[in-house]
Amino acid sequence: MRCLLLWMVVLAARAAPARSLVYRGEAVGLRADGPVAFAVHPTDATLALRGRLIFLEHQLPAGRRYNGTVELLRYHAAGDCFVMLQTTAFASCPRVANNAFRSCLHADTRPARSERRASAAVENHVLFSIARPRPIDSGLYFLRVGIYGGTAGSERRRDVFPLAAFVHSFGEPGDPEAAARTPAPSRQSRPAASGLTSSASLYDRALARSPQAPPPRPAPPRAARAGPRRPERVDETTEVEAATRAGSAFALTTPPAGPTASPAASPSRAFSAAAPAAAAQPAGDTPARFRRQLASILVPLCVLVLLLLALCAATVNCALRRRLLPCSRRVYKPRTCAACGSGTCAGRPPCRGAAPSAPATVVALGSRPKAPPLATISEE
């Protein structure tokens, strides 16, 4: 028994340590190099957490192609709200092994207007990255992923994966300049409702809602409605517009004004109430994408039409030359040789005409001289 325990301890010590962390969700899984990304200010130029989205068993979408969205959110503890940093809509993604969002035909990325240093590129195996990281960037981030099939009526599933970033500065306790330049959380996003704050966790809140604009002000009198209404501050424009332009099927609209949800209300009811409004929005139907799809259809069609016209023109030309224009046909007849009278040599040398027949030689038997007798030969 002791030998067995000692052998297990040695085997565990020699085993290679785990180098990645796998999160299993409902629609997709996430494989990250670690739960937290570290950086040192101002030494490191980029903070990045690498990983990829994968399909585990029984998670492959139905059909040959699927669509989806990837959204990068940040949680602000001071305002108890979420901020949309980037929205990416993918379309016509093939099912390549177990990799999600690989070799997609279309990818439309819309970063936030206020913060463009943070981004996510899951197609390049980068879960999120921050350019020129500062201590103020330390915090909790969420990667919200939604996948649905390309066919109508397919089920839409979403998952939220927590990520964290930690930026430390050895020379300074913090970054007061960056904190002074950061706008108030009330301008960036709206705090969650009291029901969701008390009864739901950060995971449920990030899954069920998106950053919203501050509550609208009361309507002006009728005299003021005649002129065009413009926002007083540009900062009030939220990242929800960017998510809507990107064609995200999961960007939730602002719920209508009504009684505040009770603390006993569950986040699933809030999400189910906002789901029909999100499903009514077209997924990834922007004018730029429509123009690209139209060009991808018209260009091959024009090439095929030109090839068909060229083939028809060649056929008509051949028919005219062979059928309707007999004068253009030339029949080759070899010349007759003047010497031999045949057309095989066409009068070219070494043809020298027909060979003359040799005269027959007639030999008479009686004209031959007789041989002398033997006696005469002996005397001589």
UniProtKB/Swiss-Prot annotation:
Biased composition (Pro residues): 212-221
Virion surface topology ranges: 21-293
Record flagged with keyword Translocase: no
UniProt topological domain (Intravirion) ranges: 315-380
Keyword Glycoprotein found: yes
Stretches with biased composition (Polar residues): 185-201
Biased composition (Low complexity): 249-269
TM regions (residue ranges): 294-314
Region called Disordered, residue ranges: 172-269
Glycosylated residue positions: 67
Membrane topology label: Single-pass membrane protein; Single-pass type I membrane protein
InterPro entries registered for this protein in UniProt: Herpes_gI
Cellular component GO terms held in the UniProt record: host cell; host cell Golgi membrane; host cell junction; membrane; viral envelope; virion membrane
Similarity comment: Belongs to the alphaherpesvirinae glycoprotein I family.
Assembly and binders: Interacts with gE.
The name this protein goes by in its record: Envelope glycoprotein I
Organism: Bovine herpesvirus 1.2 (strain ST) (BoHV-1)
Recorded name of the encoding gene: gI
